[in-house]
Amino acid sequence: RYLEERDIGFDVGVTKVPLVSQSCLFDLGVGSKEVRPTAEMAYQACENAGRSAPAEGNVGAGTGCSIGKYRGMGRAMKSGFGTYALQTGPLKVGALVAVNALGDVYGPDGRPAAGLLNEKRTSLSCTLEEMFADIAPAENLFAGNTTLGVVVTNGMFDKTPLTKLAGMAHNGYARAIRPVHTTADGDSIYALSLGDVPGDINVVGAMAALTMERAILRAVQSAGSAYGLIGWEDLPR
């Protein structure tokens, strides 16, 4: 409805059909399972998007996000929604991400920032170390994990280079989330071009990976404790 009101969509002659890609993440393990998103929520989100800088943390798709779920929700931490952007000359690249991962999140210094807690929930454990110790598949592995990201640029690209851009942005996932792209994760990234600035796809791809890496860290650092899950600020240090 929001797009139709603004005459945005694929022109089929008699009308314009809005093309809307979508993904979902599993957050029914927190809050009320009776709550459902509505068309009005989506419309309001579209209106809010152009008014100010996007909110981060426990908002929108980030409301029910969690990370570090290798041992289930009992040792998981709260995560959320994060953004980050870079500019070089006239070329701009931004990333938005809802981090709902099985693994832990690491900072650019290579140190863990948030994720799987130890059995007493007093400090961080390490998902990779616990996985390597198991060797055999973990029992009852929590499979409701999905990190959803978007990279946006004002660079002028069509579908083919944008597909490459989305793939390069996954390097940001690999730097910030460990492990990532597991069989228990439904990780995906969308890439959008909103401008006409000439740009090298390799440059834009490298920028996209960096913005995504930083957006993931902001997603966990902005998420406060909620639904019985510890947030980054409340993590004992």
Named regions from a protein language model:
Residues R1-R237:
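A structural signal for small-residue-enriched, beta-sheet-centric alpha/beta enzyme cores
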